[in-house]
């Protein structure tokens, strides 16, 4: 079974149609994949991977079999899409840097003839893969029955691990994030007080990163909130605050951050981020430090982080909320090359 989100679906389709994968895969699930492009214009970037009128996608979408399907035979296919809230399936080019341009792509762009095409109202581009409703659709498709529960089942013993990465410097584009181990970085974990974000005692875990990139394993208290403190030469000391972890995970990946030149005028920086989804207004109830989150527009959900620049350097609690999830962290002084992240789980 192969499950892919967004661009990953292009790789899955190419592997099954043009590689050797069709005989090895029973089910393929494409979540928010721009199967007909983020735009479709033969005169605009004709060789682009995301051009629905380009050679790559037209080749993948060429009719197959007696019904003219757009999917490789033998494999069972499902697509999951939003009704109208996927930033990359929009008739206007606003989310691809071309506001006012007709993309010639519709909300139905991720659907494929010959697949089971699932539409979930209101979900955003990332939630096509990472939401509970998307999981329910996937589970039914693979097993033929509904999941017993969509709630996260807690474990009595929780072990956490993941990789620590950083940035790679390109002369042309500047620093870009990588998934490569950041050897020599250090990680410390602190249990924190759930109302103030203050540390409770000494570090409960610490490690210097070696070639495998792993910062764990760490046996966590499933009721506790933790502050992850990352440091490495050439980087800012990065404080990441997380909600409790009810289950074990080996993919709690961490990245040491840098402070942008444009942000060095702030006394402190707190960024609330949602890696597994976007912020949508008025769809979601969101606040950062008791106010509307900066930089989150109304309409289609397409922004996954909100940056708060504080005028005071003194450390203090900062609360972030997203629907039912509540994150508490603390601010740290930019003058000491430090910044904070409130990373949402859901």
Task: Please state what every model-predicted region is.
Residues 122-131:
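Catalytic histidine-centered segment of alpha/beta-hydrolase-like enzymes
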Residues 36, 83-95, 125:
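Acidic catalytic loop of the alpha/beta-hydrolase fold
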Residues 175-191:
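Hydrophobic beta-strand segments
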Residues 165-172, 189-346:
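Preference for solvent-exposed, low-hydrophobicity sequence contexts
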Residues 139-159:
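Beta-strand-rich domain onsets/edges
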Residues 71-76, 113-115:
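Short, proline-enriched alpha-helix->beta-strand connector loops that line the catalytic pocket
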């Amino acid at each position: 079974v192969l499950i892919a989100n967004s661009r990953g679906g292009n790789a899955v389709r190419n592997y099954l149609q043009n590689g050797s994968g069709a005989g090895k895969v029973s089910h393929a699930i494409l979540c928010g994949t721009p199967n007909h492009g983020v735009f479709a214009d033969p005169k605009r970037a004709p060789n682009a991977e995301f051009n629905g009128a380009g050679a790559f996608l037209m080749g993948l979408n060429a009719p197959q079999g007696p019904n003219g399907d757009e999917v490789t035979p033998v494999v069972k296919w499902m697509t999951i899409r939003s009704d109208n809230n996927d930033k990359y399936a929009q008739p206007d080019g606003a989310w691809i840097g071309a506001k006012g341009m007709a993309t010639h792509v519709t909300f139905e762009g991720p659907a494929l003839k010959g697949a089971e095409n699932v539409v979930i109202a209101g979900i955003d581009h990332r939630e096509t893969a990472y939401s509970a409703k998307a999981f329910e659709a996937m589970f039914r498709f693979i097993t033929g029955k509904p999941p017993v529960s969509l709630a996260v089942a807690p474990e009595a013993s929780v072990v956490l691990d993941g990789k620590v990465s950083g940035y790679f410097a390109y002369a042309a584009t500047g620093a870009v994030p990588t998934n490569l181990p950041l050897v020599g970085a250090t990680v410390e974990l602190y249990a924190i007080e759930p109302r103030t974000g203050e540390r409770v005692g000494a570090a409960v875990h610490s490690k210097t990163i070696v070639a495998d990139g792993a910062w764990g394993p760490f046996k966590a208290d499933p009721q506790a909130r933790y502050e992850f403190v990352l440091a490495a030469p050439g980087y800012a000391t990065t404080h990441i605050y997380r909600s409790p972890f009810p289950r074990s995970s080996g993919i709690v990946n961490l990245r040491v951050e840098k402070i942008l030149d444009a942000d060095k005028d702030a006394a402190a920086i707190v960024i609330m981020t949602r890696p597994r989804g976007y912020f949508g207004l008025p769809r979601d109830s969101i606040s950062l430090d008791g106010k509307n989150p900066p930089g989150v527009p109304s309409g289609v959900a397409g922004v996954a982080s909100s940056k708060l620049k504080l005028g005071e350097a003194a450390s203090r609690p900062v609360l972030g909320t997203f629907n039912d999830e509540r994150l508490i962290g603390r601010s740290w002084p930019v003058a000491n090359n430090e910044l904070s992240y409130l990373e949402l789980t859901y």
